[in-house]
């Protein structure tokens, strides 16, 4: 039985862990050929798949983006059918009066500028083939001011605006661009950070919101897994969502309702 992404060529950033790796695995399951990208080494779970290629690089470096796209085109015969911008970094919950330059610069570079440059690089190929699908990973922080620090919040809000502009501008070329906004997901994006660097005063203002989010859960509730978010990405990349373009889709157990 053919998968819903059969023979499509897809670039997946953040493919070494979390939502990115889960999405790469799901895309391969659905028949896609995947070019994975991450700053971390290639995950062992994907090394033996002959439809998977990998580039270890820092997307904050512009030459890395050019290399990723050119290598993907070379390996997969001049095609890029879809781009999943999933790579992301978190801030230390700093507010506008405490955010460090390093937090701000890194969040904007990885969460906003890299997706823009990758889209800029793949759009010509997609336009030439009159088909393309771009899915950008935002966050609850992309639609709320009370979910993260100012750097992460600004970068994820910006990504939504960027995506809407791309969706409108290139709809005539049969290129779709949608956004997924996950809530709390069991990944390493926060656990890998140093809590001593957090702005705890700013973080304390968010805790009541988080308390409301995680209250009133059904019996047996568990935190959302990367694989659950990945299935949403696969749906948006498939022909089942052919009329969905420019959408911002929350995957957050009703967090977006408050």
From Swiss-Prot:
<feature type="binding site">
    <location>
        <position position="185"/>
    </location>
    <ligand>
        <name>NADP(+)</name>
    </ligand>
</feature>
<dbReference type="Pfam" id="PF00106">
    <property type="entry name" value="adh_short"/>
</dbReference>
<feature type="binding site">
    <location>
        <position position="12"/>
    </location>
    <ligand>
        <name>NADP(+)</name>
    </ligand>
</feature>
<feature type="binding site">
    <location>
        <position position="120"/>
    </location>
    <ligand>
        <name>NADP(+)</name>
    </ligand>
</feature>
<dbReference type="InterPro" id="IPR002347">
    <property type="entry name" value="SDR_fam"/>
</dbReference>
<dbReference type="GO" id="GO:0016491">
    <property type="term" value="F:oxidoreductase activity"/>
</dbReference>
<dbReference type="GO" id="GO:0044550">
    <property type="term" value="P:secondary metabolite biosynthetic process"/>
</dbReference>
<protein>
    <recommendedName>
        <fullName>Short-chain dehydrogenase/reductase olcF</fullName>
        <ecNumber>1.1.1.-</ecNumber>
    </recommendedName>
</protein>
<feature type="binding site">
    <location>
        <position position="152"/>
    </location>
    <ligand>
        <name>NADP(+)</name>
    </ligand>
</feature>
<dbReference type="InterPro" id="IPR020904">
    <property type="entry name" value="Sc_DH/Rdtase_CS"/>
</dbReference>
<comment type="pathway">
    <text>Secondary metabolite biosynthesis; terpenoid biosynthesis.</text>
</comment>
<comment type="function">
    <text>Short-chain dehydrogenase/reductase; part of the gene cluster that mediates the biosynthesis of 15-deoxyoxalicine B. The first step of the pathway is the synthesis of nicotinyl-CoA from nicotinic acid by the nicotinic acid-CoA ligase olcI. Nicotinyl-CoA is then a substrate of polyketide synthase olcA to produce 4-hydroxy-6-(3-pyridinyl)-2H-pyran-2-one (HPPO) which is further prenylated by the polyprenyl transferase olcH to yield geranylgeranyl-HPPO. Geranylgeranyl pyrophosphate is provided by the cluster-specific geranylgeranyl pyrophosphate synthase olcC.</text>
</comment>
<feature type="active site" description="Lowers pKa of active site Tyr">
    <location>
        <position position="156"/>
    </location>
</feature>
<feature type="binding site">
    <location>
        <position position="156"/>
    </location>
    <ligand>
        <name>NADP(+)</name>
    </ligand>
</feature>
<keyword id="KW-0521">NADP</keyword>
<keyword id="KW-0560">Oxidoreductase</keyword>
<feature type="active site" description="Proton donor">
    <location>
        <position position="138"/>
    </location>
</feature>
<comment type="similarity">
    <text>Belongs to the short-chain dehydrogenases/reductases (SDR) family.</text>
</comment>
<dbReference type="InterPro" id="IPR036291">
    <property type="entry name" value="NAD(P)-bd_dom_sf"/>
</dbReference>
<feature type="active site" description="Proton acceptor">
    <location>
        <position position="152"/>
    </location>
</feature>
<feature type="binding site">
    <location>
        <position position="58"/>
    </location>
    <ligand>
        <name>NADP(+)</name>
    </ligand>
</feature>
<dbReference type="GO" id="GO:0016114">
    <property type="term" value="P:terpenoid biosynthetic process"/>
</dbReference>
<dbReference type="InterPro" id="IPR051122">
    <property type="entry name" value="SDR_superfamily_enzyme"/>
</dbReference>
């Amino acid at each position: 039985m053919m998968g819903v992404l059969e023979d499509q060529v897809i670039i997946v950033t953040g493919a070494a862990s979390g939502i990115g790796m889960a999405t790469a695995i799901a895309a391969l399951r659905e028949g896609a050929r995947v070019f994975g990208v991450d700053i971390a080494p290639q995950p062992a779970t994907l090394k033996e798949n002959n439809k998977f290629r990998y580039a270890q690089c820092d997307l904050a470096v512009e030459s890395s983006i050019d290399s990723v796209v050119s290598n993907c085109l070379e390996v997969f015969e001049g095609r890029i059918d879809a781009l999943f911008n999933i790579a992301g970094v978190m801030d230390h919950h700093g507010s506008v009066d405490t955010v460090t330059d390093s937090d701000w610069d890194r969040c904007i570079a990885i969460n906003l500028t890299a997706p823009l440059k990758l889209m800029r690089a793949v759009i010509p190929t997609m336009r030439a083939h009159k088909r393309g699908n771009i899915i950008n990973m935002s966050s609850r922080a992309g639609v709320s001011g009370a979910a993260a620090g100012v750097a992460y919040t600004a970068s994820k809000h910006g990504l939504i605006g960027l995506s809407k502009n791309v969706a409108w501008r290139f709809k005539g070329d049969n290129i779709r661009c949608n956004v997924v906004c996950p809530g709390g997901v069991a990944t390493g994006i926060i656990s890998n950070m140093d809590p001593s660097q957090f702005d705890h005063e700013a973080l304390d203002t968010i805790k009541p919101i988080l308390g409301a989010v995680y209250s009133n859960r059904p019996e047996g509730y568990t935190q959302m897994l990367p694989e659950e978010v990945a299935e949403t990405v696969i749906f948006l990349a498939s022909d089942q969502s052919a009329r969905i373009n420019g959408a911002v889709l929350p995957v957050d157990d009703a967090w977006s309702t408050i």
